[in-house]
UniProtKB/Swiss-Prot annotation:
One of its GO terms (molecular function) is acyl-phosphate glycerol-3-phosphate acyltransferase activity. Probably interacts with PlsX. The chain crosses the membrane at residues 7-27, 56-76, 82-102, 116-136, 157-177. InterPro entries: G3P_acylTferase_PlsY (IPR003811). This is Glycerol-3-phosphate acyltransferase. Keywords: Cell inner membrane, Cell membrane, Lipid biosynthesis, Lipid metabolism, Membrane, Phospholipid biosynthesis, Phospholipid metabolism, Transferase, Transmembrane, Transmembrane helix. PANTHER family: GLYCEROL-3-PHOSPHATE ACYLTRANSFERASE-RELATED, INNER MEMBRANE PROTEIN YGIH. It comes from Erythrobacter litoralis (strain HTCC2594). It catalyses: an acyl phosphate + sn-glycerol 3-phosphate = a 1-acyl-sn-glycero-3-phosphate + phosphate. Catalyzes the transfer of an acyl group from acyl-phosphate (acyl-PO(4)) to glycerol-3-phosphate (G3P) to form lysophosphatidic acid (LPA). This enzyme utilizes acyl-phosphate as fatty acyl donor, but not acyl-CoA or acyl-ACP. Its main location: membrane. It is an enzyme of class 2 (transferase). Pathway: Lipid metabolism; phospholipid metabolism. Its EC number is 2.3.1.275.
Amino acid sequence: MDYNLDPSIAALIGYAFGSIPFGLLLTRMAGMGDVRSIGSGNIGATNVLRTGNKGLAALTLVLDLVKGFVPVWIAWRYFQNDIGWAALGAVVGHCFPIWLGFKGGKGVATNAGVCFGLGWGIGLAYAFVWLVMLAITRISSVAGMSAVVAAAGAAWYFGRPTFVPPLVIIAVIIIWLHRANIRRLLRGEEPRVGNKP
């Protein structure tokens, strides 16, 4: 059954899911305190990994993927005309959760869930580019930024032009949130995976 829904409502549904701060909740439940007080101060899986608990970081990653996927799936199932805006809402919710003073994560994992929700081709392109760029550069931020740009191109390639504007907005947001990483890249100071900063 399909309904017509105002795009802003679809975006709010996405935001509600995306703004669940799994990284913060899991680290607190595990007795590790506030993950925002370490590393980058973000609530995503990469910063949770800095606690030294790989299992907790992996669980955060999975749940961040799920919270991107679920609102897009709901939009596919019930609101066929508002899928892209549910996707945008989910990433915005993760990056700027109202409950945490609009300071969340950088959105790469949540956007992966979003992309798989938008279509397997888009999701696989996202994952492929992320993995290839990580293998080549061993720099997580480069892999993430490359993947978000590739997602918009993949949406166009797979015949989903209505998904391109939300994915472009998402790419701009995520790249902007990586501005400190970009500055370190330009200085040659961005840490590589497997190396201590």
